[in-house]
Swiss-Prot record:
UniProt key word Cell inner membrane: yes
Higher taxonomy: Bacteria, Pseudomonadati, Pseudomonadota, Gammaproteobacteria, Enterobacterales
Biological role stated in the UniProt entry: Produces ATP from ADP in the presence of a proton gradient across the membrane.
Location(s), subcellular: Cell inner membrane
Source organism (scientific name): Enterobacter sp. (strain 638)
Gene Ontology molecular-function annotations: ATP binding; proton-transporting ATP synthase activity, rotational mechanism
Protein name in UniProt: ATP synthase epsilon chain
NCBIfam families cross-referenced by the UniProt entry: ATP_synt_epsi (TIGR01216), PRK00571.1-4 (NF001847)
Similarity comment: Belongs to the ATPase epsilon chain family.
Any single GO CC term annotated in Swiss-Prot or TrEMBL for this entry: proton-transporting ATP synthase complex
Topology within the bilayer: Peripheral membrane protein
Subunit structure: F-type ATPases have 2 components, CF(1) - the catalytic core - and CF(0) - the membrane proton channel. CF(1) has five subunits: alpha(3), beta(3), gamma(1), delta(1), epsilon(1). CF(0) has three main subunits: a, b and c.
UniProt cross-references to InterPro entries, sorted A to Z: ATP_F1_dsu/esu_C_sf, ATP_synth_F1_dsu/esu, ATP_synth_F1_dsu/esu_N, ATP_synth_F1_esu_C, ATPsynth_dsu/esu_N
């Protein structure tokens, strides 16, 4: 039997996941993180993107995170997300429209603030589309 640890993924609205996992993959403030059983304690910010959860027995789940905090403790990991949406609950048409609008804003931005905000919106839309794509493949 594979080694596991307990994972909780919660947002301000609801608890998205609670259970035993073999590993997770998430984007932290310093880059990609793979958290396996026995990982050293860690507290870090999470960038907008996805969390890839490999549950006990190898089943995968993908959740979009708009940002948040990751805490790793012996035997348990907690993700406190600003916003969390399961891959199957994301609207592909809406994400494509958000991506298109963000690309338009980037082209028409007139200052650093406009560009930074549009870039952040584009990154979120691309992350949502990636979660949708991976969720479809996993089904």
């Amino acid at each position: 039997m594979a080694m596991t640890y307990h994972l909780d993924v919660v947002s301000a609205e609801q608890q998205m996941f609670s259970g035993l996992v073999e590993k997770i993959q998430v984007t932290g403030s310093e880059g990609e993180l793979g958290i396996f059983p026995g990982h050293a304690p860690l507290l870090t910010a999470i960038k907008p993107g996805m969390i890839r959860i490999v549950k006990q027995f190898g089943h995968e789940e993908f959740i979009y995170l708009s940002g948040g905090i990751l805490e790793v403790q012996p035997g348990s990991v907690t993700v406190l997300a600003d916003t969390a949406i399961r891959g199957q609950d994301l609207d592909e048409a809406r994400a494509l429209e958000a991506k298109r609008k963000a690309e338009e804003h980037i082209k028409s931005s007139h200052g650093d603030v406009d560009y930074a905000q549009a870039s952040a919106e584009l990154a979120k839309a691309i992350a949502k589309l990636r979660v949708i794509e991976l969720t479809k493949k996993a089904m």
